[in-house]
């Protein structure tokens, strides 16, 4: 048990994806009022860049991660949804970008791993006795929103996707060298995903 309130209980979960080397992990939050035999919808709640699954279930308003995410996975659980907050490997400043750079020449990306992780997560969620396998949604914030625009389009089992805070002026941000808000002037050199906005 990771955390428990009057309305829900959460668990830290680890799932094998490709043996023990590549795995998926996150926080499953389950409302306490689920009746025997009842199946509830699930919302997969994705953190952003440098985030962790714990960030989206944080309910202490004095914590910085609450200021960013407002505990949206916990709030959804309070409203009766099952939530799963997975970890995505876009952490460690430049470390995940090195993996991305190494993957590109062999025709892969960081999302090649993330997609495999999410396929396993969805399969697992669909197999739980208290989840509605036809109602698994995806909600991502910031880099999680980037994930929301890519993963549910490929992974079978998501019924809808919400992208929050990762969609405005995208082509201009990626392609510009004339404006200071362009990614070319940041440490996020992995952003120019050419032809994505075409």
Describe the role of every protein-language-model region.
Residues 140-152:
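Glycine-rich nucleophile elbow surrounding the catalytic serine of serine-hydrolase chemistry
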Residues 153-159:
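Conserved hydrolase catalytic core segment
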Residues 113, 160-198:
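Mobile cap/lid helix-loop segments that gate and shape the active-site cleft of serine hydrolases
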Residues 47, 87, 139, 164-165:
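Alpha/beta-hydrolase-fold catalytic nucleophile elbow
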Residues 1-38:
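N-terminal cap/lid segment of alpha/beta-hydrolase-fold proteins
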Residues 130-142:
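Alpha/beta-hydrolase fold nucleophile elbow
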Residues 35-127, 172-179:
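Cap/lid segment of the alpha/beta-hydrolase catalytic domain
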